[in-house]
Amino acid sequence: RKLLRNIAISWIMADILNMANKAVFFDRDGTLNVDVHYLYRPEDFQWTPEAVEAIEYCHQQGYLVVVITNQSGVARGYYTEAEVQRLHQWMNEELARQGAKPIDAFYYCPHHPQGKVAAYAKECSCRKPQPGMLLQACQEMNIEPARSYMVGDSPRDVEAGEKAGVKGVLYTGGSLLACVRENID
């Protein structure tokens, strides 16, 4: 009996030590912010209704918050990766100004098959609906897909999530907080 108890304790400890995180992955344009096509400047940024509250709610429920976004404007030559990164930094600064916790990570795909910038003009596994960004985030951040969600305004967002083993949630406008509360455990 003592041996069985020790084995059970070992299994429990292994589970505790290997516990994976859960996450809510958000698409950016059209989900967290109003889609203005090829957004890269903070002065053009506008949160969707109750997006800040949705981010904060996810944190309160114990989820990591991760942005997963296609940024084909890089491949098209409209803006640079540095400008994408500056906007993401600004988003977290804006969250802090509003008293909210920051987004835990940003993953973006700069590629597009018809891009004008040769280095980015290609097919890839990261551009949604492919699951590459989600799979990379799960690996790098120790996220368990089965306990996680992908929230986006496009069927390709939901498809990318499902291909990665993540539950997809289609955001159709209105309060992002209401969408999250209705669909996320």
Question: Would you name each region that the model predicts?
Answer:
Residues 27-29, 70, 153, 157:
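Acidic active-site catalytic centers that drive phospho-/nucleotidyl reactions
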Residues 51, 55-91, 102-112, 161:
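Substrate-recognition element of Asp-dependent hydrolases with the DxDx(T/V) motif
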Residues 16-66:
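Active-site neighborhood of HAD-like aspartate-dependent phosphohydrolases
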Residues 37-46, 80-82, 120-124:
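Short glycine-enriched, charge-decorated loop/helix-capping segments at active-site entrances
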Residues 35-36, 67-72, 152:
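Short beta-strands and strand-loop turn motifs
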Residues 3-4, 17:
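Leucine-biased recognition of intrinsically disordered, low-complexity hydrophobic segments
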Residues 16-22, 82-104, 113-150, 154-185:
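Asp-based, Mg2+/Mn2+-dependent phosphohydrolase catalytic module
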